[in-house]
């Protein structure tokens, strides 16, 4: 009975495979939205105010960071929790594949969330005159919460690595 349960639990990790594939579909959706934004901006580029262009560029950077986060979670999560990626020798392989454990992934995700939050906060500040003060305050508090969380996770990771 114990062997059956252990084998069933171990095999259940494959339930995550379609979830990671779903993230790749989300990446396709994000790429479509990215290029939709570019196509929307190009005809108006010469009539746009500089601040509006900067807001669009920040949105594009934001989408790029989210895309990188998706790729990192897809590949690292799959390798850590489902199976090793079998990439042929003659194909280009990302250097970090197979080297990022769950803790490293968690720290990278936290750093990415802080970067994404920073971009979002910058966009909000560029339009600060149209945003109520209490809403600005909450944006800053939420961002600082992300920063503090990422810092604490990194610090705790350093402590546990130092003690082992």
From Swiss-Prot:
Annotated signal sequence range: none
Keyword Transmembrane helix among UniProt keywords: yes
The name this protein goes by in its record: UPF0114 protein YqhA
Cell location: Cell membrane
Main localization, broad class: membrane
Regions that span the bilayer: 10-32, 53-75, 136-155
GO CC, any one term: plasma membrane
InterPro entries the UniProt entry points to: UPF0114 (IPR005134), UPF0114_bac (IPR020761)
NCBIfam families documented for this protein: HI0507 (TIGR00645)
Family label: Belongs to the UPF0114 family.
Species: Shigella flexneri
Lineage: Bacteria, Pseudomonadati, Pseudomonadota, Gammaproteobacteria, Enterobacterales
Keyword terms: Cell membrane, Membrane, Transmembrane, Transmembrane helix
Membrane topology: Multi-pass membrane protein
PANTHER family recorded: UPF0114 PROTEIN YQHA
């Amino acid at each position: 009975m114990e062997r059956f349960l252990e084998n069933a639990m171990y095999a259940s990790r494959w339930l995550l495979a379609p979830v990671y594939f779903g993230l790749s579909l989300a990446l396709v959706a994000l790429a479509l939205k990215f290029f939709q934004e570019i196509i929307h901006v190009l005809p108006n580029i010469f009539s746009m105010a500089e601040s509006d262009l900067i807001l669009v560029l920040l949105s594009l950077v934001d989408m790029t960071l989210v895309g990188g986060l998706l790729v990192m979670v897809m590949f690292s999560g799959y390798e850590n929790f489902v199976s090793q990626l079998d990439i042929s020798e003659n194909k280009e392989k990302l250097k970090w594949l197979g080297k990022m454990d769950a803790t490293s992934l968690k720290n990278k995700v936290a750093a990415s969330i802080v970067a994404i939050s920073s971009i979002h906060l910058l966009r909000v500040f560029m339009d600060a005159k149209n945003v109520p003060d209490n809403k600005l305050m909450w944006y800053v508090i939420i961002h600082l919460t992300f920063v503090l969380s990422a810092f604490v996770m990194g610090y705790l990771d350093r402590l546990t690595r130092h003690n082992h």
